[in-house]
Amino acid sequence: MPTVNQLIRKPRVVPVKRNKVPALQANPQKRGVCTRVYTTTPKKPNSALRKVAKVRLTNGFEVIGYIPGEGHNLQEHSVVVIRGGRVKDLPGVRYHIIRGLLDTQGVKNRKQRRSKYGAKRPK
């Protein structure tokens, strides 16, 4: 434990907190327009074609958002809403596109965890 004199000479430094989702600007979600919809491959032990979209947000930021679930209807100029949440095996993808909102349709034939994928209750 440092002495009072040591603390006067060199005070304690509070570590700087880095914002993980800067483009949201402290909002829960942001609206944007897809500028490019494409697939990309994940980092090393995994292998797949992950669906992602480049989105220009209303605040001018351009971010990459992950499209969750099986199948989607997004194309260029689709209006989407993004939320925070990175995809661990896709470098640079720090946002998720919310399904079942604006131009994004929910996942078809989804029985479980439906609210996460914008799917209506099956009859």
Curated annotation (Swiss-Prot):
GO terms for biological process: translation. One of its GO terms (molecular function) is tRNA binding. Keywords: Methylation, Ribonucleoprotein, Ribosomal protein, RNA-binding, rRNA-binding, tRNA-binding. GO terms for cellular component: small ribosomal subunit. The keyword tRNA-binding applies. CDD domains: Ribosomal_S12. The modification 3-methylthioaspartic acid is found at D89. It comes from the Bacteria. It holds the Pfam family Ribosom_S12_S23. PANTHER family: 30S RIBOSOMAL PROTEIN S12 FAMILY MEMBER. Belongs to the universal ribosomal protein uS12 family. Part of the 30S ribosomal subunit. Contacts proteins S8 and S17. May interact with IF1 in the 30S initiation complex. With S4 and S5 plays an important role in translational accuracy. This is Small ribosomal subunit protein uS12. It comes from Bartonella bacilliformis (strain ATCC 35685 / KC583 / Herrer 020/F12,63). The lineage of its organism: Bacteria, Pseudomonadati, Pseudomonadota, Alphaproteobacteria, Hyphomicrobiales. The gene is rpsL1.
